Amino acid sequence: MSWDLIFQHLFIVLAASLLSIAVGLPLGIWAYVSKTARPVILRIVDLLQTIPSLALLGIIMVVLDPGKLTVIIGITLYSLLPIVRNTCLGLQEVDPGVKEAARGMGMSKPYRVLMVEFPLAFPTVFTGIRIAVVNAIGTAVFAAFVGGGGLGGVITQAIRISDMSLILAATGVLMVIAVVLDLIMSWFEGQMRKSRGGSKKMWIPVAAIVLAFILLLPYGRGGTGDILLYDGDYSETQLMHHMVKMLVEDQTDLTVTIQDQMSQVNNWNSLKDDSHTCDLMISYDGTILTTFLGQDTVDVPEGMTIYDYVQGELDSYGLTQLEQLGFENTYAIGVPQALADEYGLETISDLIPIADQLTFGAEQEFFTLEGSMKYDPFVKFYGLNFQDAVSVDMGLKYSAIENGSFDVAVVYSTDGLNKKVGLKVLEDDQSFFPDYNGVFLVRDDLLEKYPEVADILNQLAGKIPTEQMAELTYQVDVEGRTVDEVAREFLVSLGLLEA
């Protein structure tokens, strides 16, 4: 966790707060002055509040692409409810005598509302702003899922590796931010109530938000550089992307910028898009086939490798796979070492006699009906009949394994957490799971512009065995070493960087 991430989080919160104020105040005033528009406006802002945060961000991202703008607009929509409702309510509660006096002085309705009623209503309006800002601090955590940055990525990673100290630290920072901002706004609110809505004082807190936003602008800029890529939400992706940066910047004059965290699917969508917000990513030929292209391993012609088939399919996307890196990260089946010792488990087939005593666990994706690399085809292929099968969030899977929530789990072969929680990875003795080989996926236009990049990155081809990648991720996820430190040390060991 770094100060940059904290300031990024604050930037997102303040930007969304300013935008929600700019949109919410006029909507609230409109709802007050128009009895016809009022129920429509209030129902719309109520409806927006009921949409799950991730779903809303996903919808916006389809239109705007990943990044901070998607998050800011999403939080803005979420923040409208308290601002719009409190604005309308505050104006309704202004003393009728004051309204009548202003009317009697010949003031026009717009002038009365803006210059007389609104200043008196502002303490109530500001309560809505205060609620919106504090709520935005928590909602901004979801920025990590759409490449928006902030502290959400830290929390997600900490949950995945069961790092309670990091979870508490990141949560503590969010709580401190929320408490400090709430105390400051509470003080301003008290001052405004004492001044009975002085028109000058009411803009002081808004001006303070604007000033803080301006100071944080450097943390809201998008990626700039010759080559852009996103940080991953797994240490494996982070390690490989940092190796890209180190090698390219060491051997050329190009600048590589690693942007905010991004999931594999969203990274793919950004990579193939014409927005040029991403130039390359690490992935796996099998993942490209099944997850990105929406095909299945049975679609690969007999005698052709997944790698070669995928490359033919990628031509229409303007993308190229570089040479295979040596490691594969396919699905694997893991069991606690104690269970393996008790029953002498070495292969997946060894589970057949005891499957009816065991609970199977995997992320929800493994239980979907589409595709051959899923639960139903797997148990039918091996003749397994588990006592129960449960789904769990990918980030919580290893915690569930440690807690004994299930006995058999789907894992990834290079995940360093397998070693941490004491899982024995069983041999896929009947070869159900195909190898998913690690490859760099690069835009063709980048290779046309900088052809040397392919040669530089292909220096890693075949140099990272699966066991080596598992050890590298273990050093990051379990031993707590930084991604930069582990990546640099490995490149030095290969002779690709100087010590």
Located regions from the model:
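Cytoplasmic-entry segments and transmembrane alpha-helices of multi-pass inner-membrane transporters
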Residues: D4, Q8-I12, L27-I59, I75, ...
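Transmembrane alpha-helices
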Residues: L14, L77, P110-F142
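C-terminal transmembrane helix and the adjacent membrane-cytosol boundary/short C-terminal tail
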Residues: K35, Q92, A169-G222
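Non-cytoplasmic
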Residues: I75, G128-V179
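Short cytoplasmic-facing helical segments at TM-TM junctions of multi-pass membrane proteins
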Residues: N86-V125
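Bilobed "Venus flytrap"/periplasmic-binding protein-like clamshell domains
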Residues: D226-V256, Q261, G326-Y398, R481-D484
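Ligand-binding "clamshell"
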Residues: S275, T291-L322, S405, L417-S431
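A bilobed periplasmic-binding-protein/Venus flytrap-type ligand-binding module shared by bacterial periplasmic
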Residues: T330-D341, Y436-Y450
